[in-house]
């Protein structure tokens, strides 16, 4: 009997383990991926019926708006992102930069099309930051505003409580969130169950709201109200904030667990809650004051405020972590100057902290909270960054479908036409809100786009100038060995950006010190257009003879170069040992000098020179002991 039982368990264990793993990943994804979109019910419907839109609270208009919300979630989240966009993974990784890298792969990088796609991808990434400063502000503020419903005499504390929560959230970032992160999934599962239950309670009382599933009501609403209805689309898109996160976080959890969570819990819960809010408004139009919190019975208001606040903090955490990850990717791809990136967990590779980004985000978010004062005012600023990124994602996905997957062009045209019609409709509606607050994310995105493009162009010019004046490395080394300078004991590592050219730091060392170490390694780091590089493909080394080695280490854009790991691997394959504290690292400290040479306008060159000067030192970025570094200065005119 026991043998049979064990045999049966063994036979079923792979499947049960796989199911358990899927559920565990889905729950983890719910805690990270769906925080933003999951907290949208706090403000979306309320904003759609803003008095500024002039839409009467009749049963017909309520059914029309709920129908628009339903079909927006179904088509954009359920079809576009979950079924189509998430197929376009870059070796398992998602997000606008990963999609951009994938779309550029089959193209000649020097063509105008490639340049336009690169600019689109970078602009999409910049708009993410425009979104990242609004999400924590509007999410936390809208949750704390529940106090105005639960205990009106505490309404004056909404702003101070919001500020305290946000400061605390950003302060804990440097300590890592791995421990509390384990609770995010279960808490967000509870959140979705609660908002679904609240919705069902009111749907049962007004079952007629289910008719909003019929797209006729959405079309009728648009036809009856025309321009007003188009303005309302700018608020309807608030239900989609966070949809891009489904794709961006795909590398952390995988497409299947995200789809599993979305179709199994998240989308049904959101739809039920929105329909419940619609039912409440049909029954009591005065509930438009705050339809989300008024779903709850009086005894449940304070617990719901607490749960909402925790859920919005989790949603904000996901956006903050996303900003760190995107910054790290952009650094590796060469679009952003080097910044100090700290790993906050020894177990989770993706747990990073970027101090500069953290404190800049907090400063801007606090200014936004104090300046806009309420989630109603801030809602006008929300949406334009989201819709701009949605349009860019659709365009890049189109290129991937045609150039990478070789899909039929007519089929791709039909699919993209539908998605672009929806995306551009939402984007156009949000452009109408530029004066009311939409200028904020657009301004942030435009400023960052200018800085990133200036940095990318400047680095390209520096590389061209360096290559034009450079000396081929291997012939130089052969000549050096034929007429060797004085050799000194020890190991020297020359970090260089081009493994084909002689490092400027070597030339200066030979010129001033006239010595060469017995063991000399020329180390170059290269970032590939894939998220991760396999360990067995990471490193290549050439023995130039006489104790001279040329080593190239390749990393994906989701990885951080590790000097120590590279030297350990090189030592294993070449039967050597390295002690960082006994090794000298030679670096060229470049000083960029703006000139009137062809390249960029002089004022942009000055901006680039300032960025170059303030980039993180290589010792910080590569985690090299500062007392083992020899920096030799060089000037580069651009």
Curated annotation (Swiss-Prot):
It comes from Burkholderia cenocepacia (strain HI2424). The chain crosses the membrane at residues 25-45, 65-85, 114-134, 152-172, 184-204, 226-246, 262-282, 291-311, 352-372, 382-402, 410-430, 434-454. The gene is kup. Keywords: Cell inner membrane, Cell membrane, Ion transport, Membrane, Potassium, Potassium transport, Symport, Transmembrane, Transmembrane helix, Transport. It catalyses: K(+)(in) + H(+)(in) = K(+)(out) + H(+)(out). Transport of potassium into the cell. Likely operates as a K(+):H(+) symporter. This is Probable potassium transport system protein Kup. Belongs to the HAK/KUP transporter (TC 2.A.72) family. It is a multi-pass membrane protein.
């Amino acid at each position: 009997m026991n043998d049979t039982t064990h045999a049966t368990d063994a036979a079923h264990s792979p499947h049960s383990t796989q199911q358990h793993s899927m559920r565990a990943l889905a729950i983890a994804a719910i805690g990270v991926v769906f925080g933003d979109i999951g907290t949208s019910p706090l403000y979306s419907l309320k904003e759609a019926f803003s008095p500024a839109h002039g839409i009467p609270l009749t049963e017909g208009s309520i059914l029309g708006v709920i129908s628009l919300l339903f079909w927006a979630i179904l088509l954009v989240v359920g079809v576009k992102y979950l079924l189509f966009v998430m197929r376009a993974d870059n070796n398992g990784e998602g997000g606008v930069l990963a999609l951009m890298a994938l779309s550029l792969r089959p193209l000649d990088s020097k063509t105008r099309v490639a340049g336009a796609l690169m600019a689109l991808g970078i602009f999409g990434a910049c708009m993410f930051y425009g979104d990242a400063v609004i999400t924590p502000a509007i999410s936390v503020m809208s949750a704390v505003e529940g106090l105005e419903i639960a205990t009106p005499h505490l309404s004056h504390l909404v702003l101070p409580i919001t500020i305290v929560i946000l400061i605390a959230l950003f302060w804990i970032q440097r300590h890592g969130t791995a421990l509390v992160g384990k609770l995010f999934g279960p808490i967000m599962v509870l959140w979705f169950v609660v908002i679904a239950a609240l919705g069902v309670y009111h749907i049962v009382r007004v079952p007629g709201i289910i008719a909003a599933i019929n797209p006729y009501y959405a079309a009728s609403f648009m036809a009856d109200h025309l321009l007003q209805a188009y303005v309302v689309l700018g608020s309807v898109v608030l239900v989609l904030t966070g949809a891009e996160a489904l794709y961006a976080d795909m590398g952390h959890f995988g497409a299947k667990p995200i789809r599993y969570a979305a179709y199994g819990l998240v989308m049904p819960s959101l739809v039920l809650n929105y329909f419940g809010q619609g039912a409440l408004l049909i029954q009591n139009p005065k509930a438009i004051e705050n339809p989300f919190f008024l779903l709850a019975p009086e005894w449940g208001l304070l617990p719901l405020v607490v749960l909402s606040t925790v859920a919005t903090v989790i949603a904000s955490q996901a956006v903050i972590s996303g900003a760190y990850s995107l910054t790290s990717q952009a650094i590796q791809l060469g679009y952003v100057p080097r910044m100090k990136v700290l790993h906050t967990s020894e177990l989770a590779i993706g747990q990073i902290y970027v101090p500069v980004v953290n404190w800049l985000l907090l400063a801007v978010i606090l200014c936004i909270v104090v300046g806009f004062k309420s989630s109603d005012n801030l809602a006008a600023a929300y949406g334009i960054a989201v819709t701009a990124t949605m349009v860019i994602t659709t365009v890049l996905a189109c290129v991937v479908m045609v150039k990478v997957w070789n899909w039929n062009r007519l089929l791709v045209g039909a699919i993209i036409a539908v998605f672009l019609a929806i995306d551009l409709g939402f984007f156009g509606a949000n452009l109408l809100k530029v004066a009311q607050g939409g200028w904020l994310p657009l301004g942030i995105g435009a400023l960052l786009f200018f800085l990133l493009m200036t940095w990318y162009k400047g680095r390209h010019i520096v590389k061209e100038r360096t290559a034009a004046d450079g000396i081929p490395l291997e012939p130089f080394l052969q000549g050096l060995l034929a007429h060797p300078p004085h050799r000194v004991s020890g190991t020297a590592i020359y970090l260089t950006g081009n493994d084909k050219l002689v490092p400027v730091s070597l030339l200066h060392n030979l010129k001033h010190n006239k010595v060469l170490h017995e063991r000399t390694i020329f180390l170059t780091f290269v970032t590939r257009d894939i998220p991760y590089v396999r360990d067995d493909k990471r490193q290549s080394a050439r023995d130039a003879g006489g104790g001279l080695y040329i080593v190239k280490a390749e990393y994906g854009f989701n990885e951080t170069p590790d000097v120590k790991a590279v030297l350990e691997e090189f030592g294993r394959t070449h039967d050597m040992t390295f002690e960082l504290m006994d090794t000298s690292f030679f670096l060229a400290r470049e000083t960029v000098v703006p000139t009137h040479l062809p390249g960029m306008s002089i004022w942009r060159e000055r901006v680039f020179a300032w960025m170059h000067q303030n980039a993180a030192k290589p010792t910080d970025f590569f985690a090299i002991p500062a007392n083992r570094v020899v920096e030799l200065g060089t000037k580069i005119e651009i």
